[in-house]
Amino acid sequence: MAKSEKHKLAQTLIDSINEIASISDSVTPMKKHCANLSRRLSLLLPMLEEIRDNQESSSEVVNALLSVKQSLLHAKDLLSFVSHVSKIYLVLERDQVMVKFQKVTSLLEQALSIIPYENLEISDELKEQVELVLVQLRRSLGKRGGDVYDDELYKDVLSLYSGRGSVMESDMVRRVAEKLQLMTITDLTQESLALLDMVSSSGGDDPGESFEKMSMVLKKIKDFVQTYNPNLDDAPLRLKSSLPKSRDDDRDMLIPPEEFRCPISLELMTDPVIVSSGQTYERECIKKWLEGGHLTCPKTQETLTSDIMTPNYVLRSLIAQWCESNGIEPPKRPNISQPSSKASSSSSAPDDEHNKIEELLLKLTSQQPEDRRSAAGEIRLLAKQNNHNRVAIAASGAIPLLVNLLTISNDSRTQEHAVTSILNLSICQENKGKIVYSSGAVPGIVHVLQKGSMEARENAAATLFSLSVIDENKVTIGAAGAIPPLVTLLSEGSQRGKKDAATALFNLCIFQGNKGKAVRAGLVPVLMRLLTEPESGMVDESLSILAILSSHPDGKSEVGAADAVPVLVDFIRSGSPRNKENSAAVLVHLCSWNQQHLIEAQKLGIMDLLIEMAENGTDRGKRKAAQLLNRFSRFNDQQKQHSGLGLEDQISLI
């Protein structure tokens, strides 16, 4: 018996190490650390193969191998986590991730130390090899990352989040994108999904400031990649991203030719100048570069022989011709789209910029519908371009005028422009309060959500999601009656509309007071219907919202009445890891409230599924499975004490 058990156990360990090796090949900022761990474990393979093939066996050896098995499970879970989680998260939370590696290393070292090597029939060479592994593990326990993390990468990511408007930000974005290998549409989509998973796996808890940081950094990387690859298909990112962002088609925003964009700011040049290296830059950008003490050309790294800047009149003329041929107003000096390190101060805006905004504000109040429509459309595009524009437009008093346009029922296009302008302005954190409180925009946005065109309703939902990032806004939005029309959009909207409604509802329902409103608005039946329609592509979002609602008394009652237990058990049986953990989270609430759900779930065969999930699920899934197993165990004990019947006996009587 011991021999057979030892053989199977050794083979299991071999398979685990090989699986860890395959996981460690994934692209991640922790790749080097993963590879080190995998390499050390691979040195154990010859010993395990000999143990598997040897005839001799003992319970002491088997027990030691069981300890190794547990430590390998922890190692596999960690590497799987690192390979699937957000890359930006791994950089920003590097200390937290390193603690996890230290813990796994400690567990491996302890497990390998108790193996009775003197009782194993293995060669001295193999014993020395295992001893080498132990030495390497102990040595790594004394380190806290060392060369695993690139300090420059960490500082660059922090600088991108702080976003102080540096003209050299594009260089930092390039470095970060290249080091994190976020240079293609596939890379960006996966990173967006990883961030969205972090929100979903929070189980209703506010993801917090760290999520906001990661979202902001990802948006800057995405904007950079799209600038250099203007033909990228953005649709998957727009549907899946957890960032609030502009909803205009690429055709609404022409990408200038590369030679017309400053190599530093990556924006259309308004005052191009030539430096001694022969390269052309935006005057203000290269001026700040030189004032920062740099003596080389940013593009060629060639030493600049002088700081003389010669106006490039030919290029300026070509830029003006390109703008005219594409129906774009030629750039003025200085241009409203030009970033500035003082963008947060409206008083520093150039006169031309101020005059341009004032002209648009006058059009917004015009009695002519065409003027209002064109002004709202232009503000929509300007607010999409960069944060400087968003700050300047909001500071000028444009938001209340845009809010007034939300209730215009006879001009759907103006209404779309207005709500999308507010969406784009809301991306700037400091504008959120102005939109919600200073301008009282929420009732108007809700009106659009109820009465607008499908595009306007979609963007209204996206706006509410953006604004609800602030906790106080969740209360205001819920009190304004936004939840019922969001439920309606989730039920009958387009695919993008459903996604927008789901993300907004998820965010709003994090606040306890909104959960009851959502239940009373009929959200639970809509979610249950979407769960049974896999082609809707809304399973992940529906389960995430159900996990939040089921923590509310009304939510538990409604979910239980919807005959949800069989559906949830099916997802635990065959769903994705995220679906399994959210289904288990819902069942934790249901089964703590109604014992009939316990009996029904066990009758459906949930016990084996939970045991498997407790061993091999995600971290959150393991916790939820353990909670359910504990609940089943306590209920069974109670029934035995009171009636002498176990849970299985009760099931047989049903």
From Swiss-Prot:
ARM repeats: 387-427, 430-469, 471-510, 512-551, 553-592
Keyword Transferase belongs to the record: yes
CDD domains attached to this UniProt entry: RING-Ubox_PUB (cd16664)
The EC number(s) this enzyme carries: 2.3.2.27
UniProt KW keywords: Repeat, Transferase, Ubl conjugation pathway
Record-level GO BP terms: cell surface receptor signaling pathway; protein ubiquitination
Pfam families to which the protein is assigned, alphabetical: Arm, PUB10_N, U-box
Enzyme class, broadest EC rank: transferase
Region entry Disordered, spans: 329-352
Name the record gives this protein: U-box domain-containing protein 12
InterPro entries: Adaptor_Cbl_N_dom_sf, ARM-like, ARM-type_fold, Armadillo, RING-Ubox_PUB, Ubox_domain, Znf_RING/FYVE/PHD
Biased composition (Low complexity): 337-349
Catalysed reaction equations from the record: S-ubiquitinyl-[E2 ubiquitin-conjugating enzyme]-L-cysteine + [acceptor protein]-L-lysine = [E2 ubiquitin-conjugating enzyme]-L-cysteine + N(6)-ubiquitinyl-[acceptor protein]-L-lysine
Recorded metabolic or biological pathway in which this protein acts: Protein modification; protein ubiquitination
Residues in the signal sequence: none
GO molecular function: ubiquitin-protein transferase activity
Annotated function: Functions as an E3 ubiquitin ligase.
Gene that this polypeptide is encoded by: PUB12
Gene Ontology terms: cellular component: cytoplasm; nucleus
tRNA processing keyword on record: no
Limits of the U-box domain: 255-329
